[in-house]
Amino acid sequence: MGIKYSNKINKIRTFALSLVFLGILVMYIGIFFRTHEVIMVLAMILGFLCIIASTAVYFWIGMISTRAIPVVCPECGKPTKVLGRVDACMHCDQPLTLDRSLEGKEFDEKYNLKGKKRVDG
């Protein structure tokens, strides 16, 4: 079948969700150190900072999501958002592009790189 691609917005949202779970896990581990107050407090603060970082990432991806170009996926027919020159459908992971020069070419996330590293095929 080939490499499975996923949508950039979904990747960042998954990262933010994992920060929430990591923060809760770190705080939960801190409870086991009730007898060592310093370790417990550090674990609670670290867990809290993970959750605050998650909030910042969710806010950031929300701002990016408002600027993303909405399109209808030709494969599944559902609305999705495209970031950059190439991206994948949020629902079916179908490779998408808005750049006519990339139509019919093999999907490569390197098309989104700026500068000298950019691949034009």
UniProtKB/Swiss-Prot annotation:
It is found in: Cell membrane. It is a multi-pass membrane protein. The chain crosses the membrane at residues 12-32, 41-61. It comes from the Bacteria. Its main location: membrane. GO terms for cellular component: plasma membrane. Keywords: Cell membrane, Membrane, Transmembrane, Transmembrane helix. InterPro entries: UPF0295. Pfam families: DUF2614 (PF11023). Belongs to the UPF0295 family. HAMAP family: UPF0295. This is UPF0295 protein BH0952. It comes from Halalkalibacterium halodurans (strain ATCC BAA-125 / DSM 18197 / FERM 7344 / JCM 9153 / C-125) (Bacillus halodurans). The lineage of its organism: Bacteria, Bacillati, Bacillota, Bacilli, Bacillales.
